[in-house]
């Protein structure tokens, strides 16, 4: 079976080329164009050439006088060519600004000036190879479908062939567009041409649509501003009645074009306001309650939940190195006024967090007032007693390098364990069970030894030599090591000789004094009256605060008094 394809009539028919050019122009402008192309793509020349394609019949599904369906293998390497004409934007900055949002791009003055250049592109040397499904019917026309991408290569000649990177860019972009054209647009173009050629009804309907479109396009256009609107307003927004509109004439200063509809103005204003959200300068929102507070006073107004003392809470506390010190051997916070102005003390944020988050935020103000009362500066006559007591406590409870690798931590002056030189006040202080439960990593042996030694010292009132011997005996009983004595004993001796200078010298306890020295304790008698007066004052303040907070913290103190535990620091 043989078929004869007559290719010459297609080359000779001028109307066929005209119609094909129009269809190709519509197809090229229908798809989204790159932003560099600023004008329509017009097909100025189309020629199918004199070399027909080669067709190989693979399958014939239906064959009759008025219909045909089969599968072909097509190969084409002829002299057909296509010429396109358009305009492109030569300034890349102008193209970049047009494709980006206005609020996110700079505003150049002259650098973004558009520069359009006419461009002419000629496509030639087509090489096609693919499988084609062809369906022919006199009633339905010709349908051609490519099962694969038929375009192998082509040659692109343009105005910018002298610029290599522009030539390569155009070659790549046009090849991509032609692949879409062969797979989607070319079958539709061939189908419409076949309907126009073999179906008279389709031709008549198409001619009628063309006449209707040309008739609508003729004649002058209507000016929507020629007649006044239904609800006219002047340039200032004042409403106008019918008599004022009729009084206006063509010779008057107020023209009809200056009358605008109030409804349209409101719509334009609403549209403008809605577009303002795209700008970076969005107006602030009024009547909005902000849930995030930055100041501590705003935080106290909000109702907070009760925080467990076993989980530390981050709290905003004004603390500085050298002004606050804590004892982290238990879960509760033990803080006092610093005994040194130099940054030699260790600071524990964990203790501060536990102390700040023990109670609910409703009692935050009362807790803050109580802390302020306990941290009032001491008078000048109490300074020697405070320094003597502090140095004595540090010398009794400080560990050695061999037994405790932890740094030397300061005992607090407001701790009930430190000042109870009178036994009556020490035996009735309440116990806090959290300290007993949370002291897991470090034993409380040092705290008990210190309290027992201070209690024995208060009862017997020994001399400074007896105090030094008791310190060495207790230190040996706690841990098996050589009898050592810290620098606190020597500071204690200086406190007796110069009470004014002992307050500053005894407070300078740094971490560099960890190595203890072996020397014999020598010193004077501690001013016992001042120490007892200080201990009584602290105990009286704690009893007053306990009675003042009985309504809010009554169950807390009762629960602590029922449990048996060594007397630790106060509960807050």
Swiss-Prot record:
Polar residues composition-biased segments: 387-400
Keywords: Lipid transport, Lipid-binding, Membrane, Mitochondrion, Mitochondrion outer membrane, Transmembrane, Transmembrane beta strand, Transport
Biological process (GO), any one: mitochondrion-endoplasmic reticulum membrane tethering
Ranges where the SMP-LTD domain occurs: 1-195
Transport is among the record's keywords: yes
Basic residues: bias regions: 358-370
Protein family (similarity comment): Belongs to the MDM34 family.
Protein name in UniProt: Mitochondrial distribution and morphology protein 34
Organism of derivation: Aspergillus fumigatus (strain ATCC MYA-4609 / CBS 101355 / FGSC A1100 / Af293) (Neosartorya fumigata)
């Amino acid at each position: 079976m043989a078929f004869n394809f007559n290719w010459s009539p297609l080359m000779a028919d001028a109307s066929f080329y005209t119609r094909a050019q129009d269809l190709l122009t519509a197809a090229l402008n229908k798809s989204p164009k790159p932003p560099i192309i600023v004008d329509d793509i017009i097909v100025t020349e189309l020629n199918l050439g004199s070399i027909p394609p080669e067709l190989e019949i693979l399958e014939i599904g239906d064959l009759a006088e008025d219909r045909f369906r089969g599968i072909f293998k097509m190969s084409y390497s002829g002299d057909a060519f296509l010429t396109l004409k358009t305009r492109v934007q030569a300034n890349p900055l102008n193209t970049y600004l047009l494709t980006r949002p206005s609020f996110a791009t700079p505003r150049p003055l002259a650098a973004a000036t558009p520069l359009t250049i006419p461009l002419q592109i000629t496509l030639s040397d087509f090489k096609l190879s693919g499988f084609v499904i062809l369906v022919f019917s006199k009633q339905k026309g010709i349908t051609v479908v490519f099962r694969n991408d038929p375009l192998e290569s082509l040659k692109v000649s343009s105005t910018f062939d002298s610029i290599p990177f522009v030539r390569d860019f155009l070659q790549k972009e046009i090849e991509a567009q032609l692949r879409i054209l062969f797979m989607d647009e070319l079958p539709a173009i061939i189908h419409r041409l076949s309907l126009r050629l073999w179906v008279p009804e389709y031709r008549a309907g198409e001619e009628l649509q063309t006449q209707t479109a040309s008739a609508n396009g003729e004649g002058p256009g209507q000016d929507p501003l020629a007649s006044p609107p239904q609800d006219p307003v002047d340039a200032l927004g004042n409403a106008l009645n019918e008599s004022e509109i009729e009084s206006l004439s063509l010779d008057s200063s107020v023209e009809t074009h200056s009358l605008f509809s109030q409804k349209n103005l409101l719509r334009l204003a609403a549209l403008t306001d809605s577009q303002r959200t795209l700008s970076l300068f969005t107006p602030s929102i009024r009547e909005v309650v902000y849930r995030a507070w930055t100041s501590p006073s705003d935080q106290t107004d909000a109702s907070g939940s009760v925080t467990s003392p076993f989980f530390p809470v981050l709290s905003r506390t004004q603390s500085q190195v050298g002004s606050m010190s804590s004892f982290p051997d238990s879960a509760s916070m033990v803080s006092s006024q610093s005994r040194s102005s130099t940054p030699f003390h260790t600071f524990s944020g964990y203790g501060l967090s536990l102390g700040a988050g023990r109670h609910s935020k409703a009692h935050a103000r009362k807790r803050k007032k109580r802390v302020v009362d306990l941290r009032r500066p001491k008078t000048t006559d109490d300074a020697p007693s405070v320094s003597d007591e502090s140095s004595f406590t540090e010398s009794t409870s400080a560990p050695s390098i061999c037994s405790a690798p932890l740094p030397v931590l300061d005992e607090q002056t407001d701790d009930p364990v430190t000042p109870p030189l009178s036994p009556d006040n020490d035996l009735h202080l309440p116990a806090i069970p959290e300290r007993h439960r949370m002291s897991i990593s470090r034993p409380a042996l040092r705290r008990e030894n210190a309290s027992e030694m201070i209690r024995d010292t208060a009862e017997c009132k020994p001399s400074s030599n007896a105090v030094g011997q008791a310190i060495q005996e207790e230190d040996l009983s706690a841990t098996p090591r050589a009898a050592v004595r810290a620098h606190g004993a020597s500071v204690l001796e200086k406190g007796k000789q110069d009470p004014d200078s002992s307050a500053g010298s005894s407070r300078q306890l740094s971490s560099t004094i960890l190595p203890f020295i072996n020397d014999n304790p020598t010193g004077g008698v501690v001013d016992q009256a001042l120490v007892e007066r200080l201990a009584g004052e602290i105990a009286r303040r704690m009893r007053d605060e306990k009675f003042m907070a009985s309504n809010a913290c009554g169950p807390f103190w009762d629960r602590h008094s029922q449990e048996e535990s060594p007397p630790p620091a106060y509960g807050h």
